[in-house]
């Protein structure tokens, strides 16, 4: 008599096994090269300085982008967060700004990119939009709740906008994206920075695992802003993070992209392109500042 011992509680067909194998190959290839993934799967082309900031920020827990107006930091953040959420299961991100309206503007950038509403991105696909959990109350899955805009992917990754009511947002856990951080107060940062104070790889169970779980992607604090007042905490973080990066601490990354970089060094795959900023625009702003 022959006995058949099933390897899993659920039988999978050969076709289904092949689908899962191909899916795993694509996901793992994307984790190794997220720039390729965002271009090939999303149809989004980034400039070279954006690619550099993207890759250096991929796995580091503490990241700061100091970028001038027109450098495309919000667009870069939209692509970065979309890629990270799709490639990393159970990855939760909060958006923190100086007001609920600003958080919603960042959310809308991600939503518009996913739903192919940005004319300057001519080859965007619907792959990310198809990964958004539609639920039963939303046609697109992007929920516009007054208490906080949000959406969730089928892999249980989630993005939520935060209000400025500090008592209402205490105790949450997840990564945080700060936009226009130069004017955010120390009190507000102190509340949201505690969101990452948990080991993302920690887990318990009632049985011993016969395998080792993979190390999870660390939670991240990503500060993005143009330059502002040196009396706010963003300036102090810029100095501290820069020193740690220069000393070789691999947990920190800082990029400083000014108007000159955008004007004179805008390239795609090493080929110089026409900048979307002009010298006249930059001179006009400098005249106002002076």
Model-flagged regions — what are they?
Residues 2-290:
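Phosphate/NTP-binding elements of NTP-utilizing enzymes
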């Amino acid at each position: 008599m022959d006995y058949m011992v099933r390897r899993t509680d659920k039988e999978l067909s050969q076709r289904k096994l092949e689908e899962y194998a191909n899916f795993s190959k694509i996901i793992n290839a994307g984790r190794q090269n997220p720039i390729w993934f965002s271009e090939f799967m999303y149809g989004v082309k980034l400039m070279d300085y954006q690619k550099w900031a993207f890759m250096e920020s991929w796995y580091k827990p503490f990241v700061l982008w100091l970028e001038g107006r027109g450098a495309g930091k919000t667009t870069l953040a939209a692509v970065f967060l979309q890629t990270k959420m799709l490639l990393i299961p159970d990855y939760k991100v909060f958006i923190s700004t100086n007001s609920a309206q600003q958080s919603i503007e960042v959310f809308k950038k991600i939503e518009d990119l996913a739903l192919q509403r940005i004319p300057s991105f001519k080859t965007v696909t619907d792959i990310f939009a198809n990964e958004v959990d539609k639920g039963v109350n939303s046609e697109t899955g992007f929920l516009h709740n007054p208490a906080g805009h949000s959406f969730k992917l089928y892999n249980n990754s989630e993005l939520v906008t935060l209000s400025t009511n500090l008592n209402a947002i205490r105790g949450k856990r997840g990564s945080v994206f700060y936009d226009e951080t130069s004017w955010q107060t120390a009190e507000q940062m102190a509340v949201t920075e505690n969101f990452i104070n948990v080991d993302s790889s920690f887990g318990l169970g009632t049985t011993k695992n016969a395998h080792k779980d993979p190390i999870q992607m660390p939670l991240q604090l990503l500060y993005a802003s143009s330059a502002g007042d040196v009396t706010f905490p963003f300036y102090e973080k810029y100095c501290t993070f820069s020193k740690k990066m220069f000393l070789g601490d691999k947990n920190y990354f800082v990029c400083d992209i000014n108007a000159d970089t955008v004007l004179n060094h805008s390239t795609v795959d090493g080929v110089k392109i026409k900048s979307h900023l002009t010298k006249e625009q930059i001179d006009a702003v400098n005249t106002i500042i002076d």
